[in-house]
């Protein structure tokens, strides 16, 4: 057994023993979601595929979470959270180089909470501090391509290492959140501060009984790991989000504008399939991005009908040598239907279609039909 696998096994055993011992001294909860089904894609430039759903191919990824809290004094508390995302079709960890995809120590009170560790950015549907969830930006509650807003807005490829975050609390009223990450563990060891990928976000808004609105300001300093490549300009992204509960229909609108984006969403296909590695590496400027996403949900009894419509326009500002197209757009739409078998178990049926042109004509996620069906169980 390799040292890395042995260390993971020892760590897992230690955590199990620690959790059992800690249960008597603090409140420890184990929760998660198991989602599986079938997934079909028919890309415009490739063969269609029908298979058992894997990672990122169900509305929510299968995950296991363990959270413990202990009261300190007055209304102050301290706690921890660790979680692993699982590819259920293979039984493997989605982030195979991490025992836990997310891990944090937190301390707070009734008004504010601070966290330290490996934490998700605000502009996705991953807890603990998802502004998308707080403002109901994605009412489909699904991360499918052609549906989720995070596919075309600022989104970190993975949860952020070395992160510090805070968030005010409360279900109603104004809120404020902040996050800072100074790069991955490997970059921290091997590169100086000026060479590492660094991310910061600040978000604020209002959550009312019917109306919710707010903004996310994102800043990212791209890494510079090749000495002879030009230094890339920093990314600045702005989200404007609003949602309203019309009763029973709920609707949300998200607008995103980005300057010097170095990816669309979390995928690496800007470099791999759109502008090419040479132009990407030799560019100081990135994408200018504009996207609008509208989502809606209509719950009625055991049924929930949801839909999403997206339009995005992107212009490459960097090295254009050899490029046939330097700008492009995508329009996509989709729907997800849920049927509640019980309080914990739901069936889902989803479909989406995306059509990208010019710069966005090659990536399959912008040019395909997608269909999915399956079951999710929460515990």
Regions found by a protein language model. Give the residues of each.
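Detector for outer-membrane/organellar transmembrane beta-barrel domains
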Residues: 195-197, 201-332
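Transmembrane beta-barrel strands of outer-membrane/channel proteins
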Residues: 32-38, 80-84, 116-118, 178-182, ...
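Outer-membrane beta-barrel "beta-signal"
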Residues: 367-379
């Amino acid at each position: 057994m390799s040292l890395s696998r042995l260390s993971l096994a020892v760590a897992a055993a230690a955590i199990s023993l620690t959790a059992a011992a800690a249960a008597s001294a603090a409140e420890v909860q184990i929760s998660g979601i198991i989602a599986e089904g079938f997934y079909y894609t028919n890309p415009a430039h490739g063969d269609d595929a029908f298979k058992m759903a894997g990672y990122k191919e169900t509305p929510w990824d299968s995950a296991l979470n363990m959270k413990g809290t202990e009261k300190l004094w007055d209304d102050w508390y301290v706690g921890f959270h660790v979680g692993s995302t699982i590819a259920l079709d293979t039984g493997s960890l989605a982030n195979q180089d991490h025992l836990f995809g997310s891990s944090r120590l937190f301390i707070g009170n009734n008004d504010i909470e601070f966290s330290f560790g490996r934490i998700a950015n605000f502009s996705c549907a991953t807890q603990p501090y998802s502004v998308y969830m707080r403002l109901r930006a994605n009412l489909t509650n699904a991360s499918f391509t052609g549906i989720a807003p995070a596919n075309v807005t600022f989104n970190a490829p993975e949860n952020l290492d070395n992160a510090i975050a805070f968030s005010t609390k409360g279900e109603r009223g104004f809120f404020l959140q902040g996050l800072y990450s100074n790069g991955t563990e490997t970059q921290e060891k091997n590169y100086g501060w000026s060479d590492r990928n660094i991310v910061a976000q600040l978000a604020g808004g209002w959550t009312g009984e019917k109306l919710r609105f707010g903004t996310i300001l994102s800043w990212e300093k791209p890494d510079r790991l090749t000495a002879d490549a030009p230094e890339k300009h920093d990314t600045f992204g702005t989200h404007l989000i609003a949602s309203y509960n019309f009763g029973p229909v709920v609707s949300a609108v998200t607008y995103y504008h980005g300057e010097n984006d170095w990816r669309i969403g979390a995928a690496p296909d800007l470099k791999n399939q759109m502008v090419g590695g040479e132009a990407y590496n030799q560019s100081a400027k990135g994408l200018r991005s504009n996207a609008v996403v509208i989502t809606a949900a209509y719950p009625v009894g055991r049924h929930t009908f949801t839909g999403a419509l997206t339009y995005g326009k992107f212009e490459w500002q960097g090295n254009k040598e050899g490029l046939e197209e330097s700008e492009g757009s995508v329009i996509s739409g989709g729907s997800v239907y849920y049927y509640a078998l019980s309080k914990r178990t739901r069936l889902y049926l989803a479909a989406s279609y995306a059509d990208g042109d010019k710069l966005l004509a090659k990536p399959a996620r912008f040019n395909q039909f997608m269909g999915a069906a399956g079951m999710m169980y929460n515990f």
